[in-house]
Amino acid sequence: MPQLDTSTWFTTILATITTLFILFQLKISKYIYPSSPELKSMKSLKHNTPWETKWTKIYSPLSLPLQ
């Protein structure tokens, strides 16, 4: 069984890591990064919600009445 012959493992692993390193470098170098990101407005927009506020309140377990 050739898998049990450990004499070629180092060469195989080294070749695999080198190939992956080169491929990732080529893939990353082709990516175009935005040169100047646009500033976004920090104003918070008011959303019109169709539900009532009383049904959307989040209750903390410690603030609930004891039963």
UniProtKB/Swiss-Prot annotation:
**Molecular function terms, GO-annotated:** proton transmembrane transporter activity
Could you list this entry's UniProt keywords, alphabetically sorted: Acetylation, ATP synthesis, CF(0), Hydrogen ion transport, Ion transport, Membrane, Mitochondrion, Transmembrane, Transmembrane helix, Transport
InterPro entries, per database record: ATP8_mammal, ATP8_metazoa
The reply on keyword Transport is yes
How does the record say this protein sits in the membrane?
A: Single-pass membrane protein
Sequence intervals crossing the membrane: 8-24
Positions of post-translational N6-succinyllysine modification: K54
| Source organism, top-level taxon | Eukaryota
Cystine residue pairs: none
- One Pfam family per UniProt: ATP-synt_8
**Chief subcellular location:** mitochondrion
Where in or outside the cell it occurs: the entry states:
Mitochondrion membrane
Q: Which GO terms describe its biological process?
A: proton motive force-driven ATP synthesis
> Under the cellular component aspect of Gene Ontology, which terms does the record hold?
mitochondrial membrane; proton-transporting ATP synthase complex
Residues bearing PTM N6-acetyllysine? K54, K57
Q: Give the UniProt family note.
A: Belongs to the ATPase protein 8 family.
Query: Whom does it interact with, and what assembly results?
Result: Component of the ATP synthase complex composed at least of ATP5F1A/subunit alpha, ATP5F1B/subunit beta, ATP5MC1/subunit c (homooctomer), MT-ATP6/subunit a, MT-ATP8/subunit 8, ATP5ME/subunit e, ATP5MF/subunit f, ATP5MG/subunit g, ATP5MK/subunit k, ATP5MJ/subunit j, ATP5F1C/subunit gamma, ATP5F1D/subunit delta, ATP5F1E/subunit epsilon, ATP5PF/subunit F6, ATP5PB/subunit b, ATP5PD/subunit d, ATP5PO/subunit OSCP.
Its biological function?
Subunit 8, of the mitochondrial membrane ATP synthase complex (F(1)F(0) ATP synthase or Complex V) that produces ATP from ADP in the presence of a proton gradient across the membrane which is generated by electron transport complexes of the respiratory chain. ATP synthase complex consist of a soluble F(1) head domain - the catalytic core - and a membrane F(1) domain - the membrane proton channel. These two domains are linked by a central stalk rotating inside the F(1) region and a stationary peripheral stalk.
Write the protein's name.
ATP synthase F(0) complex subunit 8
The taxonomic lineage of its organism, from the top, reads: Eukaryota, Metazoa, Chordata, Craniata, Vertebrata
Per the record, the gene is: MT-ATP8
